[in-house]
């Protein structure tokens, strides 16, 4: 019985997975278009920053994007397969040697820069 329930849950989750998510990782600069509802109107809001973490868990996958806005660091966690995310565009590939870039939180200015990956 438990196996049947697992198969049903897996089928439902597979149905909701997005297929148009590009391949990106920590260190990449991305632009996330988020659907924002204000009253009766719905519009797209762009959030551009560096991916500092990525969590791969199927339907529950998420990624954290960090940007500097008016001299203040802003981080936002996005659910990869959320219906509120319209699109994710990779602007720049970063050459990093870590999976999680939490050390960027303590850095500012030139020391917070990431080298571009040369292909």
Swiss-Prot record:
GO function term, MF aspect, one: structural constituent of ribosome
Signal peptide segment: none
Keyword Ribosomal protein: yes
Pfam families: Ribosomal_L19
GO term, biological process aspect, one: translation
Any one of the GO CC terms: cytosolic large ribosomal subunit
Keyword list, A-Z: Ribonucleoprotein, Ribosomal protein
Role noted for this protein: This protein is located at the 30S-50S ribosomal subunit interface and may play a role in the structure and function of the aminoacyl-tRNA binding site.
Recorded family membership: Belongs to the bacterial ribosomal protein bL19 family.
HAMAP family: Ribosomal_bL19
Name under which the protein is recorded: Large ribosomal subunit protein bL19
């Amino acid at each position: 019985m438990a196996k049947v329930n697992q198969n049903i849950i897996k089928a439902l989750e597979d149905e909701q997975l997005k297929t148009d998510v590009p391949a990106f990782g920590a260190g990449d600069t991305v632009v996330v278009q988020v659907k924002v509802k204000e009253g009766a109107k719905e519009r797209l809001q762009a959030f551009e920053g560096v991916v500092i973490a990525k969590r791969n868990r199927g339907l529950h996958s998420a990624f954290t994007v960090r940007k500097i806005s008016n001299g203040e660091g802003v981080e936002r966690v996005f659910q990869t397969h959320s219906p509120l995310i319209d699109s994710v565009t990779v602007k720049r590939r970063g050459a990093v040697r870590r999976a999680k870039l939490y050390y960027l939180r303590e850095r500012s200015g030139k020391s917070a820069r990431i080298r571009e990956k040369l292909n």
